[in-house]
Amino acid sequence: MLNNYVTSKAEIAKELNLSMPTVLANVNDLLEKKVLEETGEYASTGGRKAKSIGINKSYCHAMGILITANHIEMVLVNLGDEIIKKDRIRLKFTAELSYCTEVAQKVKTFLEGELAKDTLLGIGVAIPGIIDQKERIVLKSHALGIENYSLRFLEQALEIPVYFENDANAAMLAEKKQKYPNAIYLSLNHTLGGAFCIDGKLFRGQNQKAGEFGHMILVPGGRKCYCGKSGCADAYCAASVLTQDNRQSLDAFMEKIESGDEKVLQTWNEYLDHLAVLISNLRMAYDMDIILGGDVGGVLSDYMIPLGEKVMAYNGFEHDVSYLKNCSYKKEASAVGAAKYFFTKHMGEL
């Protein structure tokens, strides 16, 4: 139901290979709990019209937060994955306790008067870094400048169930599992992150580092990366390559492309060249769909043809790039994905 939103009892029985009495019993139970609701009727083919049923989007909500070096991004999401409120506030990250208190206050203000407290399942917090979820520790975050940083103070300050996730992993969670059960997510933000799922589940690796595509060597001996190595994909494919480390906005850069600025067009063409190499390598290694997300992913939909042509030039085994997908959320993907964790958890407990 979370994937389809609206369906019928007969379709559920067919999809799940269940008997109609079993489906009726479970659907009626969920209708009684107000998780589901009747949404209308199907056109009659003779006899009584079948009722359509769907998720009651207002049954519960979850909040998502993305923490960056200079901002926090907040969203409130309903059970239909719809963003019903969002805000982005400038707040410089510090490792001090006062930061946790300030975030908690911003959350309280954001939620004030929005919904009944008992419908809020929890807060998902997306962080750019490697996270030990069991111990509630950020093992390392170059973006925030922290190492072995405890998240328990922030958890206590929020006073609501909290889930912590790497920002790229969270963005992957924002995508529908049914649509992309096996996929790579390239998070083309200020820094380059990544994630991938297998059979609808995030693959984390032995040390929580799976999907760190930004630190694969793309150009041996090339540009210096913030991690200390040279030639990392991040130094060639992150949004910062286009924004000159935030000296200009991505929107301003794209406007210059539209106006035909030759220098900007050259930078963009080189960027797509390097991105095409990275995509080709990932496709050869994983043989799955590749979702283009993050700030740059949000604007790539208008440039899929030139990007696809460059990718095909590096891949002699395939003659199309239908595996390249645009992200579902051009903005707020990490915050939404972190929030959606609570829907999956809650539905599993019903």
Residue ranges and their predicted role:
Residues 86-88, 152-153, 159-258, 262:
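Glycine/GP-enriched mid-protein hinge/lid loop-to-helix segment characteristic of carbohydrate kinases
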Residues 87-182, 302-314:
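Glycine-rich phosphate-binding loop and adjoining helix at the ATP-binding site
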Residues 98-116, 233-236, 243-303, 326-334:
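Adenine-nucleotide phosphate-binding core of ATP-dependent small-molecule kinases
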Residues 2, 163-178, 302-350:
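Glycine-rich phosphate-binding/hydrolytic loop that grips phosphoryl groups
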Residues 38-62, 162-185:
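Conserved phosphate-binding catalytic cores of ATP/NTP-utilizing and phosphoryl-transfer enzymes
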Residues 1-49, 53, 348-350:
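Nucleotide/phosphate-binding catalytic cleft detector across ATP-hydrolyzing
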Residues 47-86, 185-198:
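Gly/Thr-rich phosphate-binding beta-strand-loop-beta motif of the actin/hexokinase/Hsp70
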